[in-house]
Amino acid sequence: MTKDFFTKGSVCFLSLNMGYGGAEKVIATLSNEFARSGREVTIVTFFEQNDFTHVLDSRIKLHNLSIQNFKMSFFSLSKFIYRHRFDNFVANIWPLTIFSFLVRLIWPKTKLIYVEHCILSEQYKDKNFTFRALQALSIAIFYRFAHHIVSVSNGVQDDLIDYGTPKKKMS
């Protein structure tokens, strides 16, 4: 991962919500550490649930896009990204990662980091062929927009490589 991500600029984390979960706990922990080090931190969510309010540093900005229709989230996120310029943008978990390519289109200098927590081929193995084909295509196309892709295990990394994710962007 680029050294600048750990030391410079504002950071925005994208999550569906901040309900209790592993990815959300990682977001809360990293956000608190970045805020304590003096960085400007924003967490943007699609839905309102926030079970981490009591543990988040008061300097962290929370923004809820209040999505009523998931199909409209593309436009809500585009508008948010356009209005707020971040130095670093971190998207956790497919399908949020595929929406985040917008960052590179709107603000090309923003460092885009994807974090994948699951073996997607296993998580969605019971979905129909069309879903799995579209998922594979979306990963092969949109994961190339990321500056860096963090996989939480070797199994997750191998799965993403099987989908066509560039190995040189991964850790």
Describe the role of every protein-language-model region.
Residues 1-171:
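Membrane-interface segments of envelope glycosyltransferases acting on lipid-linked substrates or membrane lipids
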